[in-house]
C-alpha cells in the first residue's frame, strides 16, 4: 500500500510538472512536447505561474484550464486529489500516534480504513471503495510503519509522528484555504 500510495503521489506531481512546462512553453510561444519527461533544469526555465499553489490556481483559472462541469487535466484538479490524500495520510498518522483504544492498539488497516472513510471514500466510486477495503486487510503490521519513521516502539513514535502531523496540518490548512477561496474543493 505504501508503494502504491507513493507511486500515485509521484504520478500526480509529475502531471503538475508537465502542466507547468506546457504553460511555460505556451507563455513563450513554443509548443511543449508532451511525450518528453521534464527535467529539473526545465522547471527553472518554465513560466512562474507554477511557483506556488496560489499562483498555479490563479494562472489556471485565468487561462480557463479548470472546468467545473467535467474532468480536465489541470494542476488544480490534481492538487485537489493530492490534498485529499494528504488528509488521509494525516488522519492515518494521527491514529498511529495514539495509544491503545480500550486496551488495544488499532491495526494500520483499521486506521487506514477510518482515515479513508473521512478523506477519500466520499469522492470514490463504489468499486474503488470495495477495492480499498481489500487493501486495508493486506496492510503490514504497526511495526512496519514505525520503522518508516525510524523508531522501534510506540513510545518513540508518538513525538516524531506529532511533528510530522503538525507539518502536514500546516500544509493541508493552507491548501484548503486557497482551494476554498477559489471554490475548487468539489472539482469533478
Regions found by a protein language model. Give the residues of each.
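Long, contiguous alpha-helical bundle segments
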Residues: 1-188
